Amino acid sequence: QPVDMAAPNDGSGRLFIVEQTGKIRVWNGSSVLATPFLDVRTLISTGNERGLLSMALHPNFATNRTFFIYYTDTSGNLAVARYQASVANANVADAATATVLLTIPHPGQSNHNGAKLAFGPDGHLYFGTGDGGGGGDPSGNAQNLNVLLGKMLRIDVDHGSPYTVPPTNPCVGQSGKRGEIWAYGLRNPWRFSFDRGSG
């Protein structure tokens, strides 16, 4: 089941198609290549709203070959990982470059995982997380600023290891609040976008 798509800014005309079951396929302009760009089926949990859920290409993908994926891991946790495309074959990712940037516990429910990854006009990586599932957010995650569920998060993936928190994030430096938070009180931000005019 296709759930997301990304177009590289490298002049190739390709499209990357994200399948919830764990593969990313390459459309080369005329057909879908037989060999997946990436296969993470052994790393993810599937069923209900779980799986491989989103992909974002680094703004400099054409030169650094870097991209990011969002998925539910084998324990049902939310995970964001960084990869690079192979130097030898641009249509295949190099699995050896995988680095998990962030894992967010998501206990008890298989729904409300959020899912979208996208780079903003500021060059930072944004992603939405679901509230953890269950009717009415029974754990109160979305309003709890000490957990990352039910939020819009913003991180700087170009500095630090594995990332840094932008100093302009609203909760930075506040006790009991996670600095990655950009917005909170969200139920299940499955998809979002940036205004092309105002950002």
Which residues make up each language-model segment?
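Repeat-solenoid scaffold signature
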Residues: K177-G199
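Flexible glycine/proline-enriched surface loops and loop-helix/loop-strand junctions
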Residues: G132-P138, G173-K177, N188
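Acidic/polar, solvent-exposed loop segments in beta-strand-rich repeat domains
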Residues: G135-V147, Y163-P167
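Blade/loop signatures of beta-propeller domains
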Residues: V32, N89-D94, P162-Q174
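Acidic, Gly/Ser/Thr-rich repeat motifs that build Ca2+-stabilized beta-propeller blades
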Residues: Q1-G136, R191-F194, S198-G199
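Short, well-ordered junction/capping motifs at the entry into regular secondary structure
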Residues: P107-Q109, T168-I181
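Beta-propeller blade signature
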Residues: V80-A88, G140-D158
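A fold-level detector for beta-propeller and closely related beta-sheet-rich head/sensor domains
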Residues: Q20, D122-G123, G130-D131, L148-L149, ...
